[in-house]
Amino acid sequence: MGKSGGKRPGSQKRTKTDELPIHRDLPLVIEGLPAGTRIEGYRDFVVQDLKIAAHNTRYRRTVYRLPDGSLQVADLPAEVSGHFGVQLKQFILYQVHQTHVSHARLLEQLHEYGIDISAGQLNAILLYGHDAFHAEKEALLPTAREVSGVLHTDDTSARHRGQNAVCTHFGNELFASFHTTDSKSRLNFLRLLCLPEERYSLNEEMLLSLELWGAPQVLQERIAALEEAAYLGRETFAKQLDRWGITSESHRTMVCEAALYGTLLTERWYDNLGLVSDDAPQFKLLGFVHGLCWVHAERKVSRLIPLTPQHQQAVENLRDQIWKFYQRLQAYRVAPRETQRVRLADEFDRLFQQRTGYPALNEALKLLFAKRDGLLAVLEHPHLPLHNNLSESDIREYARLRKVSGGTRSDLGRRCRDTFLSLKKTCRKLGVSFWQFLKDRLSGAATIPPLPDLMRQAAAAH
């Protein structure tokens, strides 16, 4: 029997098009039917399509001559800003930040659609008038400090003004925030942790940090003689260092790090937050709960190149033992018990203190055992993830964008890239359409709540 053209008899399954909004109904008729024929109804066939074309609106602003002889012109609608409309700006931002279309190809695309726009005008749309977007992005990390228990972090290389730079990522299941800066260092990481304000504090915590980091005694005494104070901004604090006669670059860096650390410890922003990262030195901070990524750690073993079958077998055996131990740690996270905690700690010691007949593998075991506190942080803090895959996945988006457009050439361009990438990834995690988000913010409709508010709601729901 032939197909009837509809669903199978008795099927209750709804078609995929049942809930689509219909923009146009087009009745189809048959000509030349015999007399007495009557219409019984319709069988709908829905076709999805897309309209892409220039759409120009001419606002004819009425000019009035008032009785006193003066002229008054009707105002433009509130959403009109310049000679390019909301949907065009939305499309441009989406193409660049979501689909990673290069500026040159986007300009060509717009010209083929019939849009009269220059390279300079396209650049202006991408760079200017985004203060509200920047403010929303800058609120993501402080909000995460309030509502989260875990913060993933990682970094990747970047290019800015033709020079090497670094992009640092913070994120978890609620948000992602990207920050491109000039250097990869502990000082840079501390500055980012203090966002949105870079505040330098002279207090007991700062002095303790200088002592623990082995600052010269003369430097410690000079700082200890100063009154407690707080300085807002990098330039302000740099001027204070000049007034105090601290000219050595290494001493200035050490004091800046300690002053930022003093702010973090005083504000207690990260007391209930665990950091998860690879073992990069800039992420190592005293007083922080810091879990290390097992995937990164295991690479010290997986990247070995054994030259004999015996060495190859030793590597395979150890990798098998590591991942079986990893699975037991995952089970502990779900249902932690004291007896299991002690047993896992002992098992870790036996696993990474063993010796094989492969010297390079023995060296890898020593290095992994030295990371014991970070790799076993989950035993004291079961909420910590055992890997940093979330951060690596997020930051891969930045790497793809870097391949398309290379580096940034202006500070504003760098800021826009960080902002829109952060907002896009955060929208995705919160279940918000980035396309609709752009339209909502550009039009001023504000029907989508601020992303920090959605983060708080999502955290409360969990």
What are these regions (language model features)?
Residues 41, 74-76, 160-162, 169, ...:
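Short helix/loop capping segments that flank catalytic or ligand/cofactor-binding pockets
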Residues 1-83, 153, 199-256, 263-265:
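Short, flexible loop/hinge motifs at secondary-structure junctions
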Residues 146-160, 277-278:
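Two-metal-ion RNase H-like nuclease active-site motif
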Residues 230-251, 267, 273, 277-285, ...:
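Acidic/histidine-rich catalytic cores and adjacent linkers
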Residues 51-149, 332, 424:
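Short, positively charged, Gly/Tyr-enriched micro-motifs
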Residues 274-275, 279-282, 286-318:
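Conserved beta-strand -> loop -> alpha-helix junction used to position metal-binding or nucleic-acid-contacting
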Residues 90-94, 152, 160-229, 237-240:
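Acidic, metal-ligating active-site segments
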Residues 33, 66, 92, 106, ...:
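Mobile genetic element proteins and their domesticated derivatives, centered on retroelements
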